[in-house]
Amino acid sequence: MEMDKRMKSLAMTAFFGELNTLDIMALIMSIFKRHPNNTIFSVDKDGQFIIDFEYDNYKASQYLDLTLTPISGDECKTHASSIAEQLACVDIIKEDISEYIKTTPRLKRFIKKYRNRSDTRISRDTEKLKIALAKGIDYEYIKDAC
């Protein structure tokens, strides 16, 4: 399965800055009924631990345009508490995805927009995103415009 363009467009426009890789994993499980093939322990450019999820030919972080660096086994010790915390969240999400979505307002909003927003409107938002990025316009402005 390829990365979903509608989902990416919404994540990068109307929901920019609101979602993380755990949210993306939950949305993929809810919308597409797919579980990740692999879990990758990573850090972002600021050295913050982030758990990433690998699917057939894309990662959850790609929906958010995050550049992550996988960490080695030795580095896992440094991030042990963050790893434990995020793995616990993954277990909670997987245990009852429907309940998790119902109790997370931003994910409920995302799914509602994903299901109800027309392809034309999402395409327009994606086009605005491309134009704005080419001109160097900030994501926050794009989010407000969509």
Curated annotation (Swiss-Prot):
InterPro entries hit by this protein: Poxvirus_H7
GO annotation, cellular component aspect: membrane
Top-rank taxon: Viruses
Compartment annotation: Membrane
Transmembrane annotation, as ranges: 10-32
A Pfam family it matches: Pox_H7
Induction comment from the UniProt entry of this chain: Expressed in the late phase of the viral replicative cycle.
UniProt keywords, alphabetically: Late protein, Membrane, Transmembrane, Transmembrane helix
Disulfide bonds: none
Role of this protein: Contributes to the formation of crescents and immature virions (IV).
Name this protein carries in UniProt: Late protein H7
Organism: Vaccinia virus (strain Tian Tan) (VACV)
